[in-house]
From Swiss-Prot:
Cofactor: Fe(3+)
Pfam families xrefs: AcnX, AcnX_swivel_put
Gene: lhpI
Gene Ontology terms for molecular function: lyase activity
Protein name: Cis-3-hydroxy-L-proline dehydratase
Secretion signal span: none
InterPro entries: AcnX, PMDh-L-like_dom, PMDh-S-like_dom
Phylogenetic lineage: Eukaryota, Fungi, Dikarya, Ascomycota, Pezizomycotina
Organism listed in the record: Hypocrea jecorina (strain QM6a) (Trichoderma reesei)
Regulation: Inhibited by Zn(2+). Not inhibited by pyrrole-2-carboxylate nor its derivative 2-thiophenecarboxylate.
Similarity-based family: Belongs to the AcnX family.
Stated role: Catalyzes the dehydration of cis-3-hydroxy-L-proline (c3LHyp) to Delta(1)-pyrroline-2-carboxylate (Pyr2C). No activity with L-proline, trans-4-hydroxy-L-proline (t4LHyp), cis-4-hydroxy-L-proline (c4LHyp), trans-3-hydroxy-L-proline (t3LHyp), D-proline, cis-4-hydroxy-D-proline (c4DHyp), trans-4-hydroxy-D-proline (t4DHyp) or L-serine as substrates. Because of the low catalytic efficiency, C3LHyp is likely not a main physiological substrate of this enzyme in H.jecorina.
Length: 596
């Protein structure tokens, strides 16, 4: 039982006053794919808060996780009046906080954001009503008058623009408005985030990947068009993430014009500012992918993880909207994973001895999902994968699943990723690294989680390409389909980048896939696709993406199966999926233990 009117002193990352009922969980939550931007309902079916409405409540979670688009969802909620009244975290949180900062800087809307000590946060979880004033959070018992406490926070955050940060002449010019109103607003937002991160200076960035081009609702469009109309122009090479629709085919697909036109307007606002219409969630497959050590600013959770982990480039997990701010100025906070010493692992996950012949490609997303859940905000190093010789596509699948569950922006795999030639390289000088020995049987829990559909349900749709398929994956898909016949009641769809589609078309793969019955979609990705692209009659979806198997039930209202690419093709031909676990899991489970 909490003492009556307990007071907790924390750090106010965004100042303000609020009071209301507390909705709380000790599990991180991704707002994109986890919260409906129109209603505020938690739609992540795997989360303890599933079904709750955040409107007019105080939300307490340790941090966000998963998608960089959480800032966009929160902006939608705040501008429509359906958002929470305050956010309380147990550690610094960038994505959701940035959504509040943008709402305040651009639209004059705001809510308090407070970070409490872990012990105080955990105690607060038992409260029913709370009040926030600056950095102070007070519990309010049922029947008491709702009030805001006096702000006696002992740790005020200095967000005075530029005063605590070393600025160059160029930075001052942006801040003074010498380069226009859009760049000025962008620099203000960058400096506020830099202060929150404890950065002492800004650095030049060689390229930006923008995730804010994802249409989350009217607010995302209003934000982009405002910057464009204020004269915004990117000053560094900038690519665009997947958008809400296949820009060249959405009308033929029957997408309602209210959504299709809004998505096109949003994409156009960014291309008007000079961004390239790459429209892919896998920018690491583009020729412009950064090299090891390159300082970049990428958004899109799977892309961030891949850039840091597999390419060895340096980027923070940038929230939507901060990405375009950096593109308009070419400057980013020098903090987080931009700094070499912050890239070392604090968690070691050791695998048992496995052989490549023992596994299939479902192993990597299952493992990534599990490691991400264990790691949380910690950077992990995985030992024992090198003998399996994972491909770049295997690492893509691992990273996307990892990024779904973790808030950490990178991982290491000893003998595989560039900064982990040895375990010592990955750990560096860090002390007190926790070591966990993983049992492959632990993956059975992940398998059951991702296979949320009932056993032996008919499969209606095979969903592939989350993240976007590579040319190698399209080639393998064509090989698996060759000489076989698709079930006439199963649709098969795969998403990829325009550039990848062009290469596949030249190689004759698109025609071959079409003959089997595969529809290849560009520009968009599965986390944005809804009806009627997903047929209204499709009730059960199968995918080889752990990311989509996690988010899909909440985003689509459908049941999901997860399995390897080969088993997806089998289901496309048979019309059903046998949910029997892969041999690399089932062979390790003691007889009589029961296997689904």
């Amino acid at each position: 039982m909490l003492p009556r009117n307990s007071h907790y002193k924390g750090t106010a990352y965004v100042h303000g006053k609020a009071s209301g009922p507390l909705i709380a969980s000790n599990l991180e939550l991704s707002f994109w794919g986890g919260v409906d931007p129109q209603t505020s309902q938690v739609i992540d079916h795997h989360h303890p808060l599933s079904g709750e409405f955040l409107q007019d409540a105080i939300l307490a979670i340790p941090s966000g996780r998963g998608s960089c688009s959480g800032s966009g969802v929160l902006l939608e909620l705040l501008l429509s009046g359906k958002g929470p009244k305050a956010l309380i975290f147990s550690r610094r949180e960038d994505i959701l906080t940035l959504g509040v900062v943008v709402a305040e800087e651009i639209f004059g809307r705001s809510i308090p954001v407070v970070v409490l000590a872990v012990t105080d946060f955990e105690e607060l979880l038992a409260a029913r009503y709370v009040a926030v004033n600056g950095g102070t959070v007070s519990t309010v018992q049922l029947g008491d008058a709702m009030h805001s406490p006096e702000d006696d926070s002992t740790e005020p955050l200095d967000t005075t623009l530029g005063l605590s940060i070393e600025l160059s002449n160029k930075d001052y010019a942006f801040l003074s408005g010498a380069h226009g109103q859009a760049a000025q607003a962008a620099m203000r937002i960058i400096l506020r985030m830099a202060a929150m991160e404890g950065a002492r200076k800004l650095i030049d960035i060689t390229q930006v990947h923008i995730d804010g081009c994802v249409y989350t609702g009217p607010a995302s469009l209003k934000f982009a068009e405002t910057l464009r109309d204020w004269g915004g122009k990117v000053v560094t090479p900038t690519t665009l993430n997947s958008i809400f629709v296949d820009q060249r085919r959405w009308r033929a697909q029957g997408v309602p014009s209210v959504f299709g036109e809004a998505a096109e307007k949003l994409a156009t606002a960014y291309t008007d500012m000079g961004a390239l219409p790459t429209y892919t969630c896998a920018p690491y497959l583009l020729p412009s992918a950064p090299k090891r050590g390159e300082q970049v600013a990428w958004a899109e959770s799977n892309a961030v993880v891949y850039a840091n982990s597999v390419l060895g480039a340096k980027t923070m997990k940038y929230p939507d909207f901060l990405d375009i701010c950096i593109a308009l100025t070419g400057r980013a906070p020098y903090g987080g994973l931009h700094i070499e010493s912050n890239r070392s692992a604090s968690l070691c996950v050791e695998l048992p001895v496995l052989q490549k012949a023992d596994i299939d490609d479902s192993f990597y997303p299952l493992l990534g999902y599990h490691v991400g859940r264990i790691a949380g905000s910690r950077i992990p190093v995985v030992v024992g994968v090198d003998v399996l010789r994972p491909s770049r596509d295997d690492l893509k699948a691992f990273g996307a699943a990892f990024a779904t569950m973790a808030s950490a922006p990178m991982f290491h795999i000893v003998g595989v990723t560039p900064e982990a030639a040895t375990l010592q390289d990955a750990i560096g000088r860090r002390e007190g690294v926790e070591c966990i020995r993983l049992d492959v049987t632990e993956l059975q829990t992940v398998w059951r989680t991702l296979n949320s559909a009932e056993d032996n349900s008919p499969v209606d749709l095979i969903s592939l390409g989350n993240p976007h398929f590579s040319i190698a994956e399209l080639r393998r898909l064509a090989s698996l389909c060759r000489g076989r016949a698709k079930h006439d009641k199963v649709a098969v769809m795969v998403t990829c980048a325009r550039a990848t589609y062009g290469l596949a078309d030249q190689a004759g793969l698109i025609e071959e896939l079409h003959r089997f019955g595969v529809e290849v979609i560009t520009d968009t990705c599965w986390c944005m696709i809804g009806e009627p692209v997903i047929p209204t009659t499709s009730r059960t979806i199968m995918t080889n993406s752990a990311k989509y198997a996690h988010y899909g039930p909440g985003l689509t209202g459908r049941r999901f199966y997860f399995g390897s690419l080969a088993r997806c093709v089998d289901a496309a031909c048979d019309g059903y999926f046998d949910t029997k676990m892969p041999g690399f899991i089932s062979s390790c489970i003691p007889k009589g233990a029961g296997v689904r």
